[in-house]
Amino acid sequence: MANVCVITGGGSGMGLATAKFIDKETILVLTGRTVAKLEKAKAILEAEGHEVHLIACDVSSRKDVHELCLFAASLGTIKTVIHSAGLSPAMADPEKIIRVNAIGTKNVNMEFCKYMNDGGVIVDVASSSAYQAPGFLVKHQIYEMAEYREDEFMKHMVREGNLAPGEYNKSGLAYTMSKNFVVWYAQKCAHEYAAKGIRVVSVSPGLIETDMGELEAEHAQNMIDATCAHRMGKPEELGFAIATIADERNGYLCGIDVLIDGGASTGKLFKK
């Protein structure tokens, strides 16, 4: 059977950029909420020689993700899952951000691990903001509730986001905490799924030149200034990195977060 690569948020941005670097012998399944974006991405990738299938999916819905798994499994062996779907602070309120970013990641990992076997890989896209989470708010015992006490998890995480002053800052804190969860959860899954031979890795991009990144640029000039190149990252740079991380030749790369922020996180230590 042919190998299948599923990319959530595959209609644009980093998801689409990653798809371009996936082996053309691998069947691509792109999913997202906006069908028009998916169809445009499909045309681009097919013109480059890829076989592409589309399915709409809201990752915050466990039912949607289950149906996505069934669809992908009907096409071949699910070898790779790139989970890049998510919402940024400018796109939604704290509740929706946490539901899509955190619960969405939980849904994707828990459902796809049932359909994957030895040699499979899940790459969860987090964010460099995960490293900015206030220590007193990072409570792994709360994170653990996501799998079995989802309502309590949501209530706690939304309450944390609302601690910040101002609507944008509330969404910003919720985003930071949701991505901190993604980093932690990917590491947890890496050790749990290892028995099946499935690798799990998270990737934390800095500010990237995508539609989502542009929405946040005005609030993040200091982050751009702190990078070594004094610019935002390009989607194709992240796409190549993610596709490389997912490559089976990187079999020892697992249970860790890969920070790709152009040096912004260390800039404050060395910039003069």
Question: Which functions belong to the PLM regions below?
Answer:
Residues L45-K63:
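Rossmann-fold cofactor-recognition segment
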Residues S84-P89, G263:
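Conserved NAD(P)H cofactor-binding loop of Rossmann-fold oxidoreductase domains
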Residues N107, A174-Y175, S202, N222-L253, ...:
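C-terminal helical subdomain
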